[in-house]
């Protein structure tokens, strides 16, 4: 069932057609827009006496009092059994299925950048299998090489974002492979698998920061730095940076690769932002949207 539009408008329309007692969802950490949307949905549910049940996703802990116990909570969550999929789903009579928007729909605004990965559950399983079975053997060796890393990195991030696979599921697959590995160089192979487990933890760590302190989308983590840069933007530097024309060969090569493919390894992405912030002295709140 698919609907597009304001979530409150969609729920109001459904409420006129069906008796809604509960809404089940996963806990999402997005940006200020999704945060405000979630607040509006919670208020709407209260007004209409509807239960809103949200399930944790990956290693993000909602309403965390402090960070001291985060790692312990996350690791325990990753060890839990996978929730089995339902044997069957009872369809709701009379509900319209809705249509999937086409890629040229106005709701997407700008054209897609680079090469868009295929979506779907089957594709997620295919990608993680090819990584664990073969591509991971050179993961750490190639992680800082922008061109080669396109093939030896996991490439599973979009599927984690859209929920076609979970961190818990990947970790269990990694552990299973480590225990049953028949690789010739098992020590190196397992080191690579441990490295991707570490990256999965870091992914949760960074998202947890945004969950706990959503203001960092717009403000520096340390308030002292908020006024460090002037309000005016050096548009000449910004244009050169985003087009890969700074004159720094490695920086420009990485940016051009990013613009063409729509993806670059996390390490190179961090380098591009660091170069913009420290060498070009550009405000991260502007460059972060590129």
Task: Locate each region found by the language model.
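Helix-loop-helix junctions that connect adjacent transmembrane helices in secondary transporters/permeases
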Residues: 215-250
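Contiguous, well-ordered alpha-helical segments that form the cores/surfaces of helical PPI scaffolds
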Residues: 157, 236, 240, 249-259, ...
């Amino acid at each position: 069932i698919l609907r597009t539009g304001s979530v409150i408008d969609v729920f109001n329309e459904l409420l006129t057609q069906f008796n809604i007692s509960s809404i089940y969802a996963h806990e999402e950490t997005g940006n200020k827009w999704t945060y405000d949307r979630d607040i509006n949905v919670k208020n709407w549910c209260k007004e209409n006496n509807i239960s809103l049940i949200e399930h944790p996703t990956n290693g993000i802990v909602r309403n965390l009092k402090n960070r001291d116990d985060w790692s312990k909570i996350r690791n325990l969550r990753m060890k839990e059994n996978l929730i089995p999929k339902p044997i069957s789903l009872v369809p709701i009579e009379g509900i319209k299925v809705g249509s999937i928007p086409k890629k040229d729909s106005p709701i997407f605004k700008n054209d897609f950048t680079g090469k868009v990965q295929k979506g779907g559950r089957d594709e997620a399983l295919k990608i993680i299998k090819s990584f664990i079975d073969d591509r991971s053997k050179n993961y750490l060796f190639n992680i800082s090489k922008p061109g080669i890393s396109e093939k030896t990195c996991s490439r599973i991030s979009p599927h984690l974002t859209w929920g076609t696979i979970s961190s818990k599921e990947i970790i269990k697959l990694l552990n299973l492979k480590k225990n049953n590995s028949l690789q010739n160089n098992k020590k190196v192979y397992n080191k690579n698998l441990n490295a991707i487990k570490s990256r999965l933890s870091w992914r949760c760590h960074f998202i947890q920061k945004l969950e706990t302190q959503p203001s960092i989308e717009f403000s520096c983590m340390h308030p002292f730095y908020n006024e460090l840069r002037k309000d005016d933007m050096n548009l000449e530097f910004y244009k050169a940076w985003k087009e890969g024309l700074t004159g720094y060969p490695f920086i420009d090569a990485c940016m051009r690769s990013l613009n063409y493919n729509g993806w670059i390894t996390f390490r190179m992405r961090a380098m591009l932002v660091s170069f913009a912030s420290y060498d070009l002295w550009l405000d991260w709140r502007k460059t972060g949207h590129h």
